[in-house]
C-alpha cells in the first residue's frame, strides 16, 4: 500500500491531489490495495451461474434424468 500519512481520522487517502490529478496512478489501482467491488461481483455472479447451470445439466443427464 501507500506510505502516505492520511489527513483523515479513518485512514482514507484523498482520491485527487490539490491540482486535480489522480492521487494514485491508474496502473497502481489494479495492483495495490483492495479489489474493485464490480470485479468481485462479476466473478461471483459468473460462479453462481456456472453452478446453477451444472445443476440443470445434471437434472437432464445421468441418474435423475429418467
Swiss-Prot record:
GO CC annotation terms, alphabetical: photosystem II reaction center; plasma membrane-derived thylakoid membrane
Keyword Membrane set for record: yes
Record keyword ATP-binding present: no
Subcellular location: Cellular thylakoid membrane
Alphabetized UniProt keyword annotations: Membrane, Photosynthesis, Photosystem II, Reaction center, Thylakoid, Transmembrane, Transmembrane helix
Biological process terms in GO annotation: photosynthesis
Spans traversing the lipid bilayer: 37-57
Residue span of region Disordered: 1-25
SUPFAM superfamilies, per the entry: Photosystem II reaction center protein J, PsbJ
Membrane topology: Single-pass membrane protein
Main location as per UniProt: membrane
Role of this protein: One of the components of the core complex of photosystem II (PSII). PSII is a light-driven water:plastoquinone oxidoreductase that uses light energy to abstract electrons from H(2)O, generating O(2) and a proton gradient subsequently used for ATP formation. It consists of a core antenna complex that captures photons, and an electron transfer chain that converts photonic excitation into a charge separation.
Quaternary structure (record): PSII is composed of 1 copy each of membrane proteins PsbA, PsbB, PsbC, PsbD, PsbE, PsbF, PsbH, PsbI, PsbJ, PsbK, PsbL, PsbM, PsbT, PsbX, PsbY, PsbZ, Psb30/Ycf12, peripheral proteins PsbO, CyanoQ (PsbQ), PsbU, PsbV and a large number of cofactors. It forms dimeric complexes.
HAMAP family: PSII_PsbJ (MF_01305)
Family, similarity comment: Belongs to the PsbJ family.
Protein name (Swiss-Prot/TrEMBL): Photosystem II reaction center protein J
Organism phylogeny: Bacteria, Bacillati, Cyanobacteriota, Cyanophyceae, Synechococcales
Record gene name: psbJ
